[in-house]
Amino acid sequence: IPTLEDALKAVAGRAGLLLELKVKGMAQQAVEAVQRVAFTDPVIYASFLHDELTQVRTFAPNAPLMALFGRLPRNPVVRAVTHGASHVGLRHDTATHRLVEACHRAGLLVCVYTADNPRDIQHGLSLGVDGVISNYPERIRTATK
C-alpha cells in the first residue's frame, strides 16, 4: 500500500494535489509529509472536518484550504471563512448560482464535487465555479473544449 509520501513523489513535477484529510488528527502528519518530500507543486488541503483545516493553518500558514460541505449548514460562507478556507467544495447537486456568487463575494474559490458525468460537469461549469472535482478528469477536458 503506497504511503502519502510515495504518492507525492509519484506525482511531483507533474500535478498539483487536492489532499483530503478524512481522519481527525491527521493535519500535522499530512503537512509534514508534504514538507519532507519537498513537494513544490500546488497542494490544497481539503476536509469535511473543518477543525482539521484550522490545524493545517498552524503547520502551513499559507496553505490553500478547502472547506468541503456535504449537507449545507445555515451559512457555509461564514463557516468556511471562520476556518480560514480559501476554497469551498460543494456537492455538485447542492451548488446553486446564488451560493457560488456568495462565496465569490467573500473571496472564496468554489469547486463542485464529485461530478463524474457530463451533465453534472456542465451544470457545475454553468454555475460559474472555479473548479470541478471528478474521478474522470478527461471528461472535464472534453466538457470544456
Annotated model-derived regions:
Residues I1-R71, H83-H92, H104-A106:
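Metal-dependent phosphodiesterase/phospholipase catalytic core, i.e.
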Residues I1, M66-K145:
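C-terminal active-site rim and adjoining tail of enzyme catalytic domains
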